[in-house]
Design a protein with these regions (language model features):
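Conserved helicase motor core of SF1/SF2 NTP-dependent helicases
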Residues: 2-305
Length: 305
């Protein structure tokens, strides 16, 4: 028998005496340690954890991070999933029983972007992967073709919004970036070339999400908002605007990534890893997720200086 339940069904039900021969836990790297253990003890014979500890970890309050003596990466990157994977690999050296499997192909994104993510977030850990679509399987244009005006078939674009145009706000928002994104979104999403494409707008900060949503409400007519709120024939969202955390496990044809942070690197290069200066931009987990949601094109919007 197969029983599929939400994770918190059993973690919140102390009275239910239940167990299973095999327990499979999806997105295991995102589960808080104590909650993960609650699910694991339900297994009588086998536990299968599925996840990616190079992507988003379990949630930790940002204020706790700031007050600690540890960097953001040191503090939250180590999940129970990551720890158990290391233990499983170590056990393999003693008994040659394979306990950890790493998938080595991705089929979501353009091979150039797939290689970038593999080289920058996985390769040094011995977990690099290939991108068969457009390389060993068919041609790139068979899978990643898009004809949006100005970025035709271009997988990676940097849309520069300099510090001279506007500075980041104390509440972690940057209006000039939001305006630029909404300008291009309106140009492309209603075009003939973009009518069947899905669009995602990712940022690291809730205030930037609110700013972008407000600009869409102001600059799009009600009819236009109704159009972008409809799902495509396959059930896909036309548009999603959100923080990185709301995009894990999701994919869109075209993704805008709003950086927000804008500081003069020349004056603070010796503090490049300081969490208080760069916040989530020094979190490799969040960068990994934010730069791997697109299928056809990733458009990074920020200050290149």
């Amino acid at each position: 028998n197969l029983i599929d339940v939400l994770f918190y069904h059993y973690s919140n039900n102390e009275d239910e005496d239940v167990s299973f021969d095999t327990v499979i836990i999806d997105e295991a790297a995102r589960v808080a340690p104590m909650d993960l253990l609650v699910a694991m003890v339900l297994a009588k014979r086998r536990i299968i954890l599925v996840g990616d500890h190079r992507q988003l970890p379990h949630m930790v309050d940002e204020e706790v991070i700031k007050k600690s003596d540890l960097s953001e990466n040191e503090y939250i990157n180590e999940s129970i999933f990551g720890y158990l994977k290391k233990r499983a690999k170590k056990l393999e050296t003693y008994d040659n029983i394979k306990r950890a499997i790493t998938l080595n192909n991705q089929y979501r994104t353009h091979p150039m972007l797939g290689k970038f993510v593999s080289d920058n977030f996985y390769k040094k850990h011995g977990e690099s992967f290939d991108s068969p679509l457009g390389t060993t399987i068919g041609k790139v244009e068979d899978y990643f073709n898009q004809r949006l005006e100005g970025i035709e078939n271009t997988p990676a674009i940097w849309l520069d919004v300099s510090n001279k145009e506007c500075k980041e706000q104390r509440a972690w928002s940057r209006k000039c970036e939001a305006q630029k994104i909404v300008e291009y979104l309106k140009k492309w999403i209603f075009s003939k070339e973009g009518e069947d494409l899905t669009f995602g707008i990712i940022t690291f900060y809730r205030n930037q999400v609110n700013l972008i949503n407000n600009l869409i409400k102001e600059q799009f007519t009600k009819e236009e908002r109704d159009i972008i709120n409809r799902r495509l024939s396959d059930g896909s969202e036309r548009l999603r605007v959100g923080t990185v955390d709301s995009f894990q496990g999701m994919e869109f044809d075209i993704v805008f990534l709003s950086i927000v942070r804008s500081r003069d690197i020349k004056t603070i290069s010796d503090k490049l890893k300081d969490y208080n200066l760069f916040g989530f931009l020094v979190s490799k987990n969040r960068l990994c997720v934010s730069m791997s949601r697109q299928k056809k094109s990733l458009i990074v919007v920020g200050d290149k200086e």
